[in-house]
């Protein structure tokens, strides 16, 4: 009798294989889109989900010979990138004495840490204090909810804790902030003309940014504003920009709701629609009773502590709906929250590793790249960009984690790794996603959206984005240049879209992606890392030295491979019915 060959495979080998596959599945799930935000789940609308699935290639390419070659490229190139990044700025680099003074004592293997970035240093140094505040806030909420049945009106707790937090954070400067809050509230509530009220809201909001920039230290003739306690964070105006977004959201949501009610012919008690089981999009225009748009809820929303410092940005309607009507089921799924916590810790440790082994921020601050090879200079810049991404991602995820633990689910801000981008247009959808959603709702769509005025509307959007970030001419120019860079991508996409079913289309897109990535890297390296001096040196070395030309060719090939992997990641998501358009 012939025994089938598979009977000869030991049972323990099969079991070991299944365990390994189970671990791999868990790791892939941990880093999936769905782990980040339930908003990124496949659509509950069956027709919409099937429409997305039909757009994807039904056959996966992950096991093809082509992609096995790509895996080999990854195994070679990625370690070399880390090696070059370390060599470009560590203690063995000849330029080390130029930036050694910017380094601090670290905690990993007795190494120094590059804590020279001012923004992240503030967060990193105050991280234990923030964790303590989270424990106090979440713990106090749960204790009080057990003692006093406030679960139906969470805003009571938010109002009291928010005021106390604000005084502790900004001290007497709370008075300056309060003036802005009150003026905005009066504009929204007491100017009855819908369009006029919206225009004045926008004019006052943008004017307040300029006023704070030019006269931020005003005292209103009150001596205690200059001599009194100014809190843990004396620069109250630094966080005002996020508060302004919430101020505009309240006025817009209130005026929109009032307008709808005025146009209705139903009795008042019948004019409120259903408030049951609204999804994230429906919550943006939730049919709240007009009485909910009051000064108490306004202050509770603006001072909601987990999201006050830097967001993510939640609209007024969404906040009130989740607070007083129906909490999102995601805030009760503690397994998902634990997965989110693990992913946060992974990102935190990743940044700590980079800061301990690659002193690229300090090197770029002192322009210490003399003698480095083109590959090393480019990795110095690339890891700088990764640090910028991580230093924003980590606070945003901590604040969102805090909010989830507290029972409110705001949108996830960063849904793609910075290195997982090949399109400038898609990049802006994935970067600071809650801000992008806010802009679409309150600026882009009211101005007409993506119709015949798409370019003009985009100019308006990026002008506001630039002013909101900081009032500098170079940022305004940056905003306009972004729109200029988007035009070729939009045009080429429209021209070649009809060929998407051709065998060569994916490879042509790969070439376009390489050009796009180079353009985005150059623009961001100039603006945030190397400056014009470093960029000119890199470009000179790329095109006028043998090592540079060789690196340009090899790196472009590696970027092409990376782009193909990015394409297939998105195809895999679409096969599950997920299309986040970035």
UniProtKB/Swiss-Prot annotation:
The principal localisation class reads: membrane
Supply the InterPro entries for this chain.
MB_O-acyltransferase, MBOAT_fam
- A GO CC term? mitochondrial membrane
Q: List, alphabetically, the Pfam families matched.
A: MBOAT (PF03062)
The way this protein sits in the membrane is described as:
Multi-pass membrane protein
Q: Which residues form a coiled coil?
A: none
Q: Where are the transmembrane segments?
A: 62-82, 122-144, 159-179, 196-216, 295-315, 344-364, 374-394, 455-475, 476-496, 508-528, 549-569
The entry's localization annotation reads: Cell membrane; Endoplasmic reticulum membrane; Mitochondrion membrane
Write out the topological domains of type Extracellular. Answer: 1-61, 145-158, 217-294, 365-373, 529-548
Q: Give the Cytoplasmic membrane side ranges.
A: 83-121, 180-195, 316-343, 395-454, 497-507, 570-582
Which GO MF terms does the UniProt record name?
O-acyltransferase activity
Q: What keywords would UniProt list here? A: Cell membrane, Endoplasmic reticulum, Membrane, Mitochondrion, Transmembrane, Transmembrane helix
Q: Might you name a Gene Ontology BP term for this protein?
A: GPI anchor biosynthetic process
Q: Where is the active site?
A: 469
Q: What's the family?
A: Belongs to the membrane-bound acyltransferase family.
What biological function has been recorded for the protein in this entry? Membrane-bound O-acyltransferase involved in the remodeling of glycosylphosphatidylinositol (GPI) anchors. Acts only on GPI-anchored proteins, but not on free GPI lipids. Also involved in lipid metabolism, having profound effects on sphingolipid-sterol-ordered domains integrity and assembly. Involved in cell integrity and apoptosis.
Q: What name does the UniProt record give this protein?
A: Membrane-bound O-acyltransferase GUP1
């Amino acid at each position: 009798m012939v025994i089938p060959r598979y009977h000869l495979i030991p049972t323990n080998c099969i079991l070991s294989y299944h365990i390994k596959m189970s671990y791999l599945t868990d790791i892939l799930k941990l880093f999936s889109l769905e782990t980040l935000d339930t908003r990124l789940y496949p659509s509950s609308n069956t027709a919409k989900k099937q429409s997305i699935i039909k757009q994807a290639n039904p056959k996966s390419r992950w096991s093809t010979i082509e992609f096995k070659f790509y895996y080999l490229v990854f195994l070679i190139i990625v370690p070399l990138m880390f090696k070059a990044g370390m060599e470009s700025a560590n203690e063995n680099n000849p330029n080390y004495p130029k930036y050694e003074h910017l380094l601090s004592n670290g905690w990993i293997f007795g190494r120094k840490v590059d804590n020279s970035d001012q923004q992240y240093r503030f967060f990193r140094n105050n991280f234990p204090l923030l964790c303590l505040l989270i424990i106090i806030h979440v713990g106090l909420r749960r204790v009080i909810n057990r003692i006093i049945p406030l679960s139906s009106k969470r805003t009571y707790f938010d109002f009291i804790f928010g005021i106390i937090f604000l005084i502790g954070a900004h001290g007497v400067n709370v008075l300056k902030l309060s003036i802005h809050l009150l003026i905005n509230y009066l504009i929204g509530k007491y100017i009855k003309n819908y369009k006029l009220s919206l225009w004045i809201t926008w004019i006052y909001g943008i004017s307040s940014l300029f006023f704070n920039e030019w006269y931020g230290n005003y005292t209103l003739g009150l001596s205690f504003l200059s001599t009194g306690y100014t809190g843990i964070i004396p620069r109250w105006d630094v966080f005002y920009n996020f508060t302004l977004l919430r101020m505009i959201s309240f006025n817009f949501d209130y005026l929109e709701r009032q307008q709808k009610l005025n146009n209705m012919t139903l009795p008042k008690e019948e004019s409120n629609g259903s408030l049951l089981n609204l999804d994230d999009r429906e919550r943006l225009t939730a049919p709240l009773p007009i009485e909910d748009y009051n000064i108490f809820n306004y202050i509770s929303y603006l001072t909601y502590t987990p999201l006050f410092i830097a967001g993510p940005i939640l609209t007024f309607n969404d906040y009130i709906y989740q607070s007083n009507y129906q909490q999102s089921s995601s805030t009760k799924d503690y397994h998902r929250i634990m997965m989110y916590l693990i992913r946060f810790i992974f990102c935190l440790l990743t940044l700590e590793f980079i800061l301990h082994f690659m002193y690229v921020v300090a090197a770029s601050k002192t322009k210490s790249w003399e003698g480095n090879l083109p590959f090393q200079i480019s990795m110095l810049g690339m890891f700088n960009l990764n640090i910028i991404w991580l230093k924003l991602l980590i606070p945003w995820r901590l604040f969102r984690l805090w909010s989830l633990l507290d029972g409110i689910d705001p949108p996830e801000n960063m849904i793609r790794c910075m290195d997982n981008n090949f399109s400038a247009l898609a990049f802006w959808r994935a970067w600071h996603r809650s801000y992008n959603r806010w802009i679409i709702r309150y600026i882009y769509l009211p101005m007409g959206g993506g119709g015949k005025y798409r370019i003009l509307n985009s100019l308006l959007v990026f002008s506001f984005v630039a002013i909101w970030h900081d009032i500098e001419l170079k940022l305004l120019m940056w905003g306009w240049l972004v729109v200029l860079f988007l035009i070729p991508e939009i045009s080429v996409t429209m021209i070649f879209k009809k060929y998407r079913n051709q065998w060569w289309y994916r490879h042509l897109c790969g070439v376009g992606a390489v050009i796009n990535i180079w353009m985005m890297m150059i623009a961001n390296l100039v603006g945030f890392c190397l400056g014009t001096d470093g960029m000119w040196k890199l470009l000179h070395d790329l095109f006028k030295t043998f090592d540079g030309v060789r690196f340009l060719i090899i790196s472009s090939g590696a970027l092409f491979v990376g782009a193909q992997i990015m394409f297939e990641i998105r195809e895999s998501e679409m096969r599950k019915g997920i299309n986040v358009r970035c």
